[in-house]
């Protein structure tokens, strides 16, 4: 099968990676192929159904593939690790999709590499299917994200903390896998020339219009800050908690990446944490905008030598970008909140209107997704909201203020903005448990609902229901390594 690889990272950035083969697997079996994505990439899904097990397990890579493990560093929970890198993944190449966009193809769970740091480099079935589900859920919501092209069972049992688990490999598609941590890897070694080469490559690949800017590296820093501010605002608007916002998990492209301990919040609480390793709540839902700025500061540090030869002027330029991050984020968040509330135009009091609703939701632990979805029904029937609030009077003072700001077509616009289906934690776990038992039908049904999150259907009612009371209080997510 022809993939038409054009591997610019391997060609242009020698010394930024290690050439490495995928580990052999005993009995690969294609579990699921993302046929719409395959077509988007210009690939033949029928042919991939037949040959995908061999290709996406790494046993028989297509002609032109160049498997490599990328080097990067990163701050993990605030502590700097100078060498991380692809410890269980291989970039096999780049292709151009039907829209003319360059896309990475990466095998995740393909075995040990020089960056594995003692781990086995493999992935278990549960984390692979989880990333497939949540990535497609984010795509359905219109949020920039890496996506899964395929999931392959390897036929190899893996020993994990919870016991023996079947092995699997995910084929991940991304605009690129360049991270803040990629810049940090070379900056930490004072290899300014490679930082410059990486910046030039990232500009050419993701922000080519900046190449002719008076100060292209400063413009690049601003562009990444803008892309990430918009991304995190969109996470917040749907109640998404990434769970591990380390700098090696922040992309230069502005795509969401790495869905290990992520989860969607149900009852609204800014302090919500699901990750089993986030013991201090560093990456709690409400902290994500602050971590956004913190991570961008680390990128700024790596770029300082490119911003100006004078250290003081370079710091001033970096700070001039950092000082805008809060306003960038708030602007995207408020624009999104106006859409979620169905407001007409923009007025000064809109932020307060939104914040007062959130405070009422917090005090009642109201379901994030259903509250905003049922607000569309409340345009004509305020009773639609009452089941979501323990205290029926919680919104009495707020509703008239909201009604005064509604657009004429508010209900229709709100239903197109506020999803009815998200990847609720209990439904994801049910689908994964069934998959472990050999039944992928629940996975498929959930995936179908998540692909159309704004379209409410009677036969998908179960996917809209919150978890049983108390479920999320004890629910914990894991990295899957």
Curated annotation (Swiss-Prot):
The keyword Membrane does not apply. One of its GO terms (molecular function) is AMPylase activity. It catalyses: L-seryl-[protein] + ATP = 3-O-(5'-adenylyl)-L-seryl-[protein] + diphosphate; L-threonyl-[protein] + ATP = 3-O-(5'-adenylyl)-L-threonyl-[protein] + diphosphate; L-tyrosyl-[protein] + ATP = O-(5'-adenylyl)-L-tyrosyl-[protein] + diphosphate; L-histidyl-[protein] + UTP = N(tele)-(5'-uridylyl)-L-histidyl-[protein] + diphosphate. This is Protein nucleotidyltransferase YdiU. Nucleotidyltransferase involved in the post-translational modification of proteins. It can catalyze the addition of adenosine monophosphate (AMP) or uridine monophosphate (UMP) to a protein, resulting in modifications known as AMPylation and UMPylation. The gene is ydiU. PANTHER family: PROTEIN ADENYLYLTRANSFERASE SELO, MITOCHONDRIAL. InterPro entries: SelO. Its EC number is 2.7.7.-, 2.7.7.108. Its cofactor is Mg(2+); Mn(2+). The keyword Nucleotidyltransferase applies. Mg(2+) binds at residues 249, 258. Pfam families: SelO. It comes from Cereibacter sphaeroides (strain ATCC 17029 / ATH 2.4.9). It comes from the Bacteria. Belongs to the SELO family. ATP binds at residues 85, 87-88, 108, 120-121, 172, 179, 258. Keywords: ATP-binding, Magnesium, Manganese, Metal-binding, Nucleotide-binding, Nucleotidyltransferase, Transferase. The active site is at residue 248.
């Amino acid at each position: 099968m022809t993939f038409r690889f054009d591997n610019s990272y391997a060609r242009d950035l020698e010394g930024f990676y290690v050439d490495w083969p995928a580990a052999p697997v005993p009995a690969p079996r294609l579990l699921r192929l993302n046929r719409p994505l395959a077509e988007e990439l210009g690939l033949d899904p029928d042919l991939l159904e037949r040959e995908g097990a061999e290709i996406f397990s790494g046993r028989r890579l297509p002609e032109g593939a160049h498997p490599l493990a990328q080097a990067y560093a990163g701050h993990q929970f605030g502590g700097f690790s100078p060498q991380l890198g692809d410890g269980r993944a291989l970039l096999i190449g780049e292709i151009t999709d039907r829209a003319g966009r360059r896309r990475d193809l990466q095998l995740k769970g393909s075995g040990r590499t020089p960056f594995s740091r003692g781990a086995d480099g493999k992935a278990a079935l549960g984390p692979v299917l989880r990333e497939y589900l949540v990535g497609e859920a984010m795509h359905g919501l219109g949020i920039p994200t890496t996506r899964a092209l395929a999931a392959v069972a390897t036929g190899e049992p893996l020993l994990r903390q919870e016991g023996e688990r079947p092995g699997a490999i995910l084929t991940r598609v991304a605009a690129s896998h360049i991270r803040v941590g990629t810049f940090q890897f070379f900056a930490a070694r004072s290899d300014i020339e490679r930082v410059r080469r990486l910046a030039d490559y990232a500009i050419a690949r993701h922000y080519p219009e900046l190449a002719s800017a008076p100060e292209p590296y400063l413009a690049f820093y601003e562009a990444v800050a803008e892309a990430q501010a918009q991304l995190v605002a969109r996470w917040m608007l749907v109640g998404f908690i990434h769970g591990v916002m380390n700098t090696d998990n922040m992309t230069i492209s502005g795509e969401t990446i790495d869905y290990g301990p992520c989860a969607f919040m149900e009852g609204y609480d800014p302090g919500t944490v699901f990750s089993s390793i986030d013991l201090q709540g560093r990456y709690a839902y409400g902290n994500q905008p602050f971590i956004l700025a913190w991570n961008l500061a680390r990128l700024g540090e790596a770029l300082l030598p490119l911003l100006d030869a004078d250290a003081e002027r370079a710091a001033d330029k970096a700070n001039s970008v950092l000082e805008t991050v809060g306003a960038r984020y708030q602007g995207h968040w408020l624009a999104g909140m106006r859409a979620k509330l169905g407001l007409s135009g923009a007025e000064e009091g809109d932020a307060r209107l939104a914040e007062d609703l959130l405070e009422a939701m917090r005090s009642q632990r109201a379901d994030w997704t259903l509250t905003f979805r049922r607000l569309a029904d409340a345009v004509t029937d305020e009773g639609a909201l009452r089941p979501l609030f323990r205290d029926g009077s919680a919104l009495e003072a707020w509703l008239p203020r909201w009604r005064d700001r509604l657009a004429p077509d508010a209900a229709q616009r709100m239903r197109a903005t506020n999803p009815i289906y998200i990847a609720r934690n209990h439904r994801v776990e049910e689908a994964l448990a069934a998959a472990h038992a050999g039944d992928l039908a629940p996975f498929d049904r959930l995936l179908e609902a998540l692909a159309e999150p704004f379209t409410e259907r009677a036969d998908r009612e179960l996917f809209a229901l919150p978890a049983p009371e108390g479920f999320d209080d004890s629910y914990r997510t894991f990295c899957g390594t």
